[in-house]
Amino acid sequence: MIERSFSGRGPEIKLPAGAIDAHLHVYLSGFPALPGGPGLPEGQPGLSEYRQVMGWLGIHRFVITQGNAHHTNHANLLAALKETRDVARGVAAIDGETSDAELEILKDGGVVGTRIVDLPGGAVGLSQLEEVDARAFAAGWMIAIQFDGSDISDHVDRLSSLRSRWVLDHHGKFLRGVVPDGDEVAMLKRLVDGGRCWFKFAGCYESSFEGGSDYSDVAEVSKVMATHAPERIVWGTNFPHNTATRTTDYPNDAALLDTVLNWFPDDRARHLALVENAEKLYGFQSIAN
């Protein structure tokens, strides 16, 4: 059994007005897990729990990402967006069988992107990258892409050819480790420099060999990227931390926020990641206007 904390002592770093959490999942009652993906997280943390976290951390807007448990069935995502449309956007999981009619329903419901997860349990893998890119580009959507970043050399040419704006999830998710001056990071920099690639700070614990509380190995690469291209970084909580299956593994969201946001070189870079960059990538109205 896992016990999650949704409130507590606030973070030391105060989030700016309009701060956007660019990666979270919610699990509403009545929407079962589908074959091929993981099961639902214990307790099915939903919008009421996430709203507590919003208040705790000072989040103002957010992006609900389709959970792997629901694969390509978007009923849960659309129901959650219906309740939160004024402050939320959605990222779906479309594939070659998704109809044009469903795409219109998703767009009308607040979806602004789709995801590819080329890992066990993912609904749509890199085998469909070009097809998904074509449909996302036509819809004006972004793509969130997740795979073992240690294999980036196998995919860099295809990723460089994408027409859609896209974000590499979870600090690159280098599951076999990475060093800041390695070839993998050099390739990542080139992708970001191409103008259509973003880099997401979220779920650092999923690929860290060093572990908490500082996740120093992931921190080294993330600091390099935040300095190299502060205009291409977004941040997310990764709520409800689905890889944590025991209470002792569940991170304190306020402490984790402070840890990760200290990887930015300065306040301006933090503000870009938390507000302006995410506004551009996910189609939120600019609070500057």
Model-derived regions: residue spans:
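Hydrophobic faces of well-ordered beta-strands that scaffold small-molecule active sites
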Residues: 20-24, 62-65, 88-92, 114-116, ...
